[in-house]
Amino acid sequence: MKKIYIKTFGCQMNEYDSDKMADVLNAAEGLTPTSTPEDADVILFNTCSVREKAQEKVFHDLGRVRHLKQANPNLIIGVGGCVASQEGAAIVARAPFVDVVFGPQTLHRLPELIAQRRETGRAQVDISFPEIEKFDHLPPARVEGGAAFVSIMEGCSKYCTFCVVPYTRGEEVSRPFDDVIAEVANLAARGVKEITLLGQNVNAYQGALDEGGTADFAFLLEMVHEIPGVERIRYTTSHPREMTQRLIECYGKLPKLVSHLHLPVQSGSDRILAAMKRGHTVLEFKSIVRKLREQRSDLCLSSDFIVGFPGETGADFEATMKLVEELNFDASFSFIYSKRPGTPAADYADDVSAELKTQRLMRLQARIEAQAQGVNRSMVGSVQRVLVEGQARKNANELAGRTGNNRIVNFAGPSRLLGQFVDVTITQALPHSLRGEAVTLETLHT
């Protein structure tokens, strides 16, 4: 049986896309996943261009599999994702052993691109932006466990000065409303209990309705909430500018919507937010969070932060630290600023030293880590509804699951609980997870 190896970098959208690549090639050629490139007939790198030196990391990984191509000329090597979208044919020019280069919007054409490569003997490059076409050509998703991702829109039209996403994934394009609802209903009918709605700017969703007009994100959430079998709803990633009052009110009336929100802020300084072209102030962000917690008092908040953005002073950074403490963020994706080619900020003077950037990042992460541990400790003694995702990472005899507020819980229980909800009493708070005991453990083993 032919095998496919996919290495994925970056965001959950890329994780979703990698699953779809595997689905497409399984349907077309019967390829099944392997965890080792040495066993593969097709090797794909699904790349991310958000972080520094992303291109060099891709070529480094390509270099590590070049010998496999030399040993087996029939091996197909492909590069997809955002670096592929940025670099295009330049990838083949630098690494001539690459067979296919494709963007996030053309992954559905993989079987065709591979067939053309075999037929012509020439590398194939397709990094076009055919809007939402790919969703019409994807096979039904595989269901593994009780949770699934559903992509509802692609791209971003915000053009923050530091970000490459609008250039690599294109402008915002929403899937038709009925297509999203049909996919969610199909997943629920196949046993999926938790749905995560995905998009680069997911709350900017404006899906076309069959009867005319559009559905906004709040309406989509309300309709997903009504689908039988769906018991928990998440979404990522959102933008503060699209956090409408209707969406905020969903936290007061949709109990299936989890008590966790990832809402990127990037900085606590109005001056830096303006330089980033974020389109909101610190006060406006704080107002959004206040309104959200009026609707859902136990809402846990995570965010994205960039430290050392061009022009960031000590006062700017202290404003970020103040915001972190005021709003009690308890998780983050936080990074040192690095120039991304083709973005407006790449022309700014990168005037914060590497040493200072590192110091600031360490302070920020330590503060958020302390706040996260405070939340974890506050959960000890409570009973949490946990969706079992698999075996515990460090103990194969235990199960691991996730709470509504996005905490990992490890506890003893039989493997048949995979994909099921279990009530778990939290007994211990660890730095990055919780331990617990299933409330009805005596019945779980029968």
Curated annotation (Swiss-Prot):
Keyword Translocase: no
TRAM domain boundaries: 377-440
UniProt: [4Fe-4S] cluster 2 binding residues: C156, C160, C163
Keyword Endoplasmic reticulum: no
MTTase N-terminal domain boundaries: 2-119
Superkingdom assignment: Bacteria
Signal peptide: none
Uppermost EC category: transferase
Binding site for [4Fe-4S] cluster 1: C11, C48, C82
GO MF annotation, one: N6-isopentenyladenosine methylthiotransferase activity
Matches recorded under PROSITE patterns: MTTASE_N, MTTASE_RADICAL, RADICAL_SAM, TRAM
Main localization, broad class: cytoplasm
Cell compartment(s), UniProt: Cytoplasm
InterPro entries registered for this protein in UniProt: Elp3/MiaA/NifB-like_rSAM, Methylthiotransferase, Methylthiotransferase_CS, Methylthiotransferase_N, Methylthiotransferase_N_sf, MiaB_methiolase, rSAM, rSAM_horseshoe
EC number of the protein: 2.8.4.3
Task of the protein: Catalyzes the methylthiolation of N6-(dimethylallyl)adenosine (i(6)A), leading to the formation of 2-methylthio-N6-(dimethylallyl)adenosine (ms(2)i(6)A) at position 37 in tRNAs that read codons beginning with uridine.
Subunit-level organization: Monomer.
HAMAP family attached to this UniProt entry: tRNA_metthiotr_MiaB (MF_01864)
Protein name stated in the entry: tRNA-2-methylthio-N(6)-dimethylallyladenosine synthase
Upper taxonomic lineage: Bacteria, Pseudomonadati, Pseudomonadota, Betaproteobacteria, Nitrosomonadales
Gene: miaB
